[in-house]
Amino acid sequence: LKYGDIQLSFLKPSDARAAFETGAVDAWVIWDPYSSAAVAQVGARVLVDGVGAADNYNFYIATKPYSEHHPDVLTLALEEIRINDRWIESHLKESAAIVGPQVGLPDDVAETALGHYAYGAQLLTGDVVVKQQKMADAFSDLELIPKKVSIDSVVWHPAH
């Protein structure tokens, strides 16, 4: 399929799940924990997981003025995230028992979703910036975003 062969519906996850369950949409592109919930609770099957097609990253963001005036806080926050990541990764069951109720999922589904994540927050590498730029350019070419953006211009580069 090409982009022009499909009709996109931009829905928030809860609305998208309802549309998927009722057959209002034929397919659903979604991330964890929603994908794990759809497989476990709705009987959905994963058609493509994105491995090799698109890398999935999570980003922590701050305003430019904040990052310029408080780099020490951001550095500390990044280290604390790494510490928490290590704990979560080595205590998936306990983490799922905490996260599951917060997102309205059974512990086993939350544990499956947590098991899919890549842990270990790090600063953006040049490789990640290049990949994100390619994606941003594709979105711009498809007119999914209103104008071209420069990914590198918004990446935090702390002073060493």
Language-model region placement:
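Short, contiguous strand/loop micro-motifs
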Residues: 3-4, 21-22, 83, 122-123
